[in-house]
Amino acid sequence: MILGVALVRPSPVLVAVRDGAPEWPVSRVAARAAARACVAVDLGDVPTAAVAAIRVGGPCPEVLRPRVGSGTATIVRGGHSLTGRVLAPLDTEAVRRFAATCGLTDFAVTATGSPMLADHELAVAATIAAEVPQARITLSYEFGHPGLREREQATIRNAALGPEAGRIADEAARELPGMPVFFARSGGGLVSAHYFRRYPLACDLGGTASLARGRVVLPGVPGEVAAAYGAAIGRPEAQVERIVQARGRAELDRVLQDARDEALTRVVSAGALPGSARIAETTVNPLSYLPDGLYRVRVTAEGAMP
């Protein structure tokens, strides 16, 4: 039996799935007999943490500075072009001072050019970790968007969701002791609780995605039931998005293989049985209005449940 859980107010809705057939309502005692639980939740209204945002790049007008709500932000010198050229040396001392004085533990780091070369983001993360050992750090290159503002906002959002995602995962573990728990992704599929804690942004609209999936199979049931069922019938999935530079077909094939290998590793981290991981989709698009040989690559991998 697989347990689908829709986290809705005032209380979660539980659906048991046996051989694809749904059963509800389900008592909490019966729920604990499930082989695994798959949770559907939207994170749009959950509490968010104050974030310390660091942008690595050149100066900009006030209106274009990072937007962090109740948090704080700084811009430090550094960054790369989308072709990997260093725009300026990284100001590590400015990073250290900001980390030491901001008073926060949730950090979002965005460097210009990091989808192509993440060296400065990784160096910033190392500096933060040395200064604030308990820091939770999100790096923008892991999200792959070519646009700085889009990538920066995704990074800040992921960092802001981190503490609440941890609380949700902890609560699920307490309610379902010893049971593997997965969370529904916004784009479909599932991720492990560990992955959910690290990349909650991937599950920002997990409830909505599960509802759409469940409605296809169960069009006449209440929305919460459809969402719980939609989560229960999912499978582990992960996506890698990168900006790559390739001069010629052979080099493009090589960087595509690197992206596929990373996607396969990531889907196993998301909970897939290692031997079952496979590439579900690869898209490659040239970037317009930029030097030849720059591509946006998106690879989706999926796998079976353990």
Regions found by a protein language model. Name each.
Residues M1-P306:
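N-terminally biased helix-coil "hinge/interface" segments that flank
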